[in-house]
A protein has these predicted regions:
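Active-site neighborhoods of divalent-metal-dependent phosphate/nucleic-acid chemistry enzymes
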Residues: 66-115
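Short, well-structured N-terminal submotif of metal-dependent ribonuclease cores
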Residues: 1-36, 46-60, 132-133
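Acidic, PIN/NYN-like endoribonuclease modules and their adjacent C-terminal/linker elements
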Residues: 1-2, 104-133
Length: 133
């Protein structure tokens, strides 16, 4: 199964949260195909005052994912989502790009913030800590 992993889960892994550690181990072992959006990559790298050792560990961790850049199709999809959901549901541009990444790649979105995404048609957003993956 292809899954786009949201920032919150990566942060949990770095903090040693058991569910996140288990999930990323499944990706590393190939049980799940892990994708990461450019937005998540940016959010992770924006952590303040990261030591060289921590930065090295983060880069190694991010290496288990297939990186999904924001290409034209993703940008167009995100724009359509914003047009449809920004006013009615408060969809933020970064969340629109993450949702678009999942939709364009026909992947499930793994996030701890399902409320940010549950209303988007054609997107499956799951809290992997609550679900049997």
């Amino acid at each position: 199964m292809k899954v786009v992993v949201d920032t919150s889960i990566i942060i949990d892994h770095l903090r040693g949260v058991p569910q996140a550690v288990k999930l990323l181990k499944e990706i590393e072992e190939g049980s799940l195909e892990g994708l990461i959006s450019t937005i998540t990559l940016m959010e992770i790298m924006a952590a303040p005052k990261m030591s060289k050792e921590r930065l090295s560990a983060v880069k190694e961790l991010l290496g288990i994912f297939e990186h999904c850049p924001v290409d034209n199709q993703t940008a167009i999809t995100a724009g359509s989502l914003l047009a449809k959901y920004r006013r009615s549901h408060g969809l933020e541009p970064m969340d629109a790009l993450i949702a678009a990444t999942a939709r364009v790649n026909e992947a499930v979105l793994f996030t701890l913030n399902t409320r940010h995404f549950k209303y988007i048609e054609g997107l499956i957003a799951v809290n992997p800590y609550d679900a049997e993956v």
